[in-house]
């Protein structure tokens, strides 16, 4: 048994548990925590891991409705494991003005950066400058999963030494074969298959297909709601960010 990997899974569990102590799925998982984590460990090392059913619902509290897929608690642990393994490397490559779901780079930080750039470009408001505002329609649902996986695998293979160096001191590193296996299982999992859809028909009636994973092209789209989806989307967009 690889006790370092098992310990890393336990740590991922404790990280996922933060802020979810009172949820039904977390409480159910915690009742059999040791057994559940050992079973997850066995599934991972024996290459039998498959993501479970997600719960799909519409987030209606915001001005714009969002389709959210809530992963099974077990799968959230795997998402955390993957995220913590690769995020330190890719965070170093992102441009300074990429703000989506990045620690310490929230809305206030973005506003301050925008103010800095406007003042710099306009020479402290003494000459005109322009701001380009655009949006990639249905971005999450247009991400090609085959391209995403190829990008991740190619970059990690070419920068494996940097990947190892980027890890915080004391953190266990997955070997490349296991990391690529987990990336493949998560990226190519179709969250729409056998998912549990919640919400009345009235709530869903006027939801635009362009904003739904159910209407994405084959092998395209990432579920909004997964921790890994946020990181993957930043990695996928990074080439465009660098070009801009």
Predicted regions, residues:
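Non-catalytic, well-ordered alpha-helical scaffold segments
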Residues: 7-10, 34, 38, 71, ...
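Short beta-edge/loop segments at beta->alpha junctions of small alpha/beta modules
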Residues: 4-10, 51-58
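Mid-sequence acidic-hydrophobic segments that form the walls
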Residues: 43, 80, 84-93, 117-121, ...
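Non-catalytic, polymerase-adjacent accessory regions of viral genome-replication enzymes
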Residues: 1-38
